[in-house]
Amino acid sequence: RRMMFEWVLKRLAEHELLSGKTVGVDSSTIEANAAMRSIVRKDNGESYQEFLTGLAQVSWVDTPTAADLATFDRKREGKKTSNDDWHNPHDPEAKIAKMKDGTTHLAYKPEHAVDLVTGAVVSAEIHPADQGDTATLLGTLAKAAENLAEVS
């Protein structure tokens, strides 16, 4: 993939379709192909379902059903699922994140830099979804500068 990206950048440079003077950066959040219901605690490997069952047993019922747990989880005060405590063992790089529609999913943060004169993408990076724009912006700009320097 990287070789294809470099090949395209070289073709754009050969045809003078890169100005490299003004670059814009944009990011988004995309849902990972990993289910929240598969997350486990980092410290002991306990599943989210097991965690909820333990809370429910302490709170009100010895053998909660799946429907009981879903209702309990939805109504639970102060609920917070942290990347510090939880991960998906099948996709450990996916991070718990709030999506634009307000739902919580495992996700990634794609970020790209575009030559604003020509519209050419000069860098495309994937970051952890729990990193804000200020944490990733400089890295994406540095990669864009490196890519432009390689083809100039």
Name these PLM-found stretches:
Residues 1-152:
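Polybasic low-complexity intrinsically disordered regions
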